[in-house]
């Protein structure tokens, strides 16, 4: 097996039994692919910007004399790169330029004669670009656009579950949902009449829409009903017989066939009777005339002579009507075939309640419903109806919608127009009637075949189209104004509405979210999130249980575990590991093909719709050596149900056992032993883990850690293989392998590392190289670790030695007892970086000034500021310290005589400005790590800004010079090799200046050309360097683009080191969370017989009721893994021979069942083995994949190999008394995370502060510097104790008795501790509210 550079250094023992048929796909592809589709030119014009332009252009003037056509578009280069955008607080975007063609037609000449054509490139605003990690930088902050799960366009049939009508009758409905345009609903009422609604407005009889489509009553009936023919023969009334139609009816007369009575009067017609009639081949039977009474005529019958209407279509026949038909000479007439069972008379009944009789009346009725109060004209009514469903500008089903529509109506062809047709509407009504008749089923709305994913690209395209449509209206008006000869396309188009629409979407849409950047996992998960909320989606209040529930089609598509707790449960989901979207936006999951019981390696992606057709076995089905399915009956899934089938019936099989879960859930070892509720908490809490100071890989992992670390983009991955040429803390240089070089390039890759930057959640982002000079790396290898990664693996927490035992009540109710040593070793210390900004504005009274000259502030407070009034980098500051001195001019006030005197003596300055400096918020302490000053163009830069500018220039020059030197050395190295090969000596070359080498001649012509090419490269490199430096210099020197009225912004970055302390929240990966109750001295902790104390003590009662047994297995396996590491450590200390080490390692990696993944130590070189052994001293990392993990006997075997008790329990001693505890205790290693719920951020106490305006009560919460709520139950407590005075002051002077509290304050100042309670303000509010209801309340004093 080939290992990557970092894998080889620390090989993880894998307990998985199944081979990986499919590698874990790139985890961010849903974001990147979608946006790529939006941005890249699409010649077909089906999606992206191209589609948006083509749908709006060409724009024709109202008169038709001019037309604006779209030719093509191009995106320019972004001005600033991603990092610069983040620092400057601007959007990372590229300008969009569109080539438009304006065509003017000659009005006088024949139609279509072109008078003039003008072409021009027009600027259409900025389009935000996606970074390579799938995020957007909007106004300097990283944001993620979450994908949306919405109802797919198409046609859906449903019923109301009997909730609408009091009788509990089930009412069916059909709904045609377009991608954009009006919704069309058909629904039955309790009397079985069919109605139509447009856009959920007032309902109309469904026949109205058919009349508006120009159907007559006859045509409507012919479309929806079969007919029965009656014929008058020799004075008898004969009926055409279709025997099947009589099923279930009660004969009202004798049914006679070939002279024999088959069914007697009053008997029910059964299947036997029908068979008899079919056998006798009877085509007509005689019926009494009364049988026809009440039947409904299928056609209009007009008198051949007089032309008057004898019977109209849909008229119920009477004896008289039948007689009239005979008289008029109609020997044969047809009636509608209906029955109660499966041929209801719905459409016929609906026609009866329909008041309209012509197309015009129907159109007017629809117009009145859509535009109540407007007088309808024929043109307006026709135009409105045409625009509703038949105009491609107003209505679009989209390709997805058309595909779903045609599939649901069982059509062969899946393509068609985006608008509706007559047939579409009629067929929907027919299908709805079929469902009402019991011949078809309703749809399942929550089936993933009926819900699709709308990703970034598609949503951005829709927003862009909205902007274009706004522009279209303006352009049409301008084209009609005349004088077009002088206008150019640029004069017609205003880019504002377009950029406003795009900006609004990226900046403030519900689905554009501030990226969760706690750790790499939270980034990846956020980008893979699927939300049912948002514009065009559901709302929290409306969503019921069904939508939130796990559906069988979620299998392998959406994770059944990872979803938030609380009001959003089930509405926000996460993509499963292997899931992807297909061209229509439906989720697909991969399956291996099974042919005649033999599993192949062929993988097919199936959507939820396709999956229903197949029989699918699970990934852990037993197989033979040659890949056949072993068992007689195999558990499998078919049509959303679990069943057992024979091997030859199985068509597909899961790709991997991890297929059903998301990335976060796949990181939980022994997930299969955890209760789902706890697993949900576990996967959610991993996203809140704060990156620790030194990342520590999990001893017990799942093998998924590497994929997350690499795909998240926090690590640095080598793009091409080569040798490490240079490495330091801030850059890595790789000399690329010869075979990966592009022709004519220097062959040097330079990777700059991110150092100590702030993340969205104020955690620290820092990259550290994990390679050594001169080592070879391959493409795709991790060369530098980021936050929460360790040797290219995700490392969210720390491996701590845990004991499950009670300890003096300090672990009551999930509290956690922690060893002091964990604090000393900085195991759970985290770094947080806060950004504080000071803005200097231009006020009415004059500009605010940033200065060190602040009125009424002592020297001590200014000691950390430089002469510009800005804090030094490296200063240690605490709450209340001034970071940036700033003074604001204040208005002239009336002065007292004393002040006038003081001003006369001491001059003007101090009085006309007030101190508005930026201070460190209360409770914050830390070190200033960076200061940035942004100055508006045209405002003179202060000394500090110039210093920073000089420093940046210096650094940029140094970086570029080093980069240039490295590349130049590469070029000279290649030319040197060429010249040495051509026979020049080392000495001669060394004597010459290196630039002169290019002037030497080589006899071999090909080599000479190569040398000349290298010389050209050198010249290009030099020019490139100068250009880059000039660009950099221009960017650094130019003024900043600040908001209107802002002169200067100073940003100060504080780094805070937070050690673990009581009150911090910690958690394992199994939903086992708790708060630290005490940091216990090392000597008091329970320890083993060798005197090694445990790091952390957990409560054993937290396990049984929560049913997350995975944590116990993790602890046992962790103990074994650590034991192996300690055994290796002992071998190193005993200086055992290398071959012994190899043998032991081989024994460890071979342990387990025969299917377990093998590692061949023999393949590794001696150096590799030494590195590996050195890294394994701290413990052997193991992987136990989800649903395919280590078995109990394997854990025991590993414990045995590590010379540890197989029970995983040891005797512990009490650190305080030295006595052994009565029972053995489960001790082992658990991976514990420190969550971003730190007590420092929550601690808060109010002294005096602001009050709410209406109730005059103190505000609540830390952000408002609020008080603690003294609630209902607290009042009861004081009442119960009879503490009347305490209660009185709580409800008055300490809360909202305005006069009382001011008096109280005054009294305390005077040293008089009395209180005079008055009327609480909230009581006055109550009085006012009662009065507002019209009830007068007066307070009478006794």
Curated annotation (Swiss-Prot):
One of its GO terms (biological process) is DNA-templated transcription. The RNAP catalytic core consists of 2 alpha, 1 beta, 1 beta' and 1 omega subunit. When a sigma factor is associated with the core the holoenzyme is formed, which can initiate transcription. SUPFAM superfamilies: beta and beta-prime subunits of DNA dependent RNA-polymerase. The gene is rpoB. Keywords: DNA-directed RNA polymerase, Nucleotidyltransferase, Transcription, Transferase. The keyword Transcription applies. One of its GO terms (cellular component) is DNA-directed RNA polymerase complex. CDD domains: RNA_pol_B_RPB2. The keyword Transferase applies. It catalyses: RNA(n) + a ribonucleoside 5'-triphosphate = RNA(n+1) + diphosphate. It comes from Aeromonas salmonicida (strain A449). Belongs to the RNA polymerase beta chain family. This is DNA-directed RNA polymerase subunit beta. GO terms for molecular function: DNA binding; DNA-directed RNA polymerase activity; ribonucleoside binding. Its EC number is 2.7.7.6. DNA-dependent RNA polymerase catalyzes the transcription of DNA into RNA using the four ribonucleoside triphosphates as substrates. InterPro entries: DNA-dir_RNA_pol_bsu_ext_1_sf (IPR042107), DNA-dir_RNA_pol_bsu_external_1 (IPR019462), DNA-dir_RNA_pol_su2 (IPR015712), DNA-dir_RNAP_su2_dom (IPR007120), DNA-dir_RNAP_su2_hyb_sf (IPR037033), RNA_pol_bsu_bac (IPR010243), RNA_pol_bsu_CS (IPR007121), RNA_pol_bsu_protrusion (IPR007644).
